[in-house]
Amino acid sequence: MMKRILLTCAALLLSGQALADDCANASTQAEMNTCAVTQYQTADKELNETYQNALKRAAPPQQELLKMAQTAWIAMRDADCALISSGTEGGSAQVMIANQCLADKTAEREAFLASLLQCEEGDMSC
């Protein structure tokens, strides 16, 4: 059983590296679309982890403000990316353009929230 788990983990790690290599060499629109979706999913996962850590460290009044800010930020990010990708609406590149936008803005937000974690516990003003 343990051997099976280790083999599965190794396969997942190798497939992640293979995907990164594939993305560096993506040449078709379908490959580029897949890579952009994967990049966004990775950025979103990192953001969610950082957001949960920020919520845990925030004082109760700040937790509510952070939740409100995050909800507003998601709406703005989605609207911005819809606008940015609207020029390619119906085209094969729309998925890539939209997901690159989502990945970039999500990574920026994750970096911002990570900077809040550098503050002393309960102090989000640094």
Regions found by a protein language model. Give the residues of each.
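Sec-dependent N-terminal signal peptides
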Residues: 2-16
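N-terminal alpha-helical modules
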Residues: 18-126
